[in-house]
Amino acid sequence: MKWLFKYLIRFYQKYLTILSFGSCRYYPTCSQYALWQLDNNTFFKAIYFTILRILKCNQLFDGGFDYPIIKLKKNQNINYNKIKIVYWYVPLKNGKYLVVKNREWKKNNE
């Protein structure tokens, strides 16, 4: 189910945002926020937070920076392979983290 929504969002980003002239009030944009939520949360949580974000993207809110906040369970497995950092997880409190995309990863791997 996630792959279908990711495909629809990428289609929107590539073909339909031409009509909106970059009108998102937040960084990351609402569509990018949705992709990050789908990558880091369960499907239903991602849809819920994305809908809330879209409802806040209007003239009644100031906008600004609004990174996804997720709960992350620490993995105790040790991996000795080379790692690829796609997202940075910035700790907040009580096991919640801000999700920030690693921009260098995209330059080197896509």
From Swiss-Prot:
Top-rank lineage group of the source organism: Bacteria
Intracellular or extracellular location(s): Cell inner membrane
Q: Which GO terms describe its cellular component?
A: plasma membrane
Keyword Cell membrane attached: yes
Membrane topology for this entry? Answer: Peripheral membrane protein
Q: Which UniProt keywords apply?
A: Cell inner membrane, Cell membrane, Membrane
* One Pfam family in the UniProt entry: YidD
Q: Which family does it belong to?
A: Belongs to the UPF0161 family.
According to its UniProt entry, what is the function of this protein?
Could be involved in insertion of integral membrane proteins into the membrane.
Protein name in the entry: Putative membrane protein insertion efficiency factor
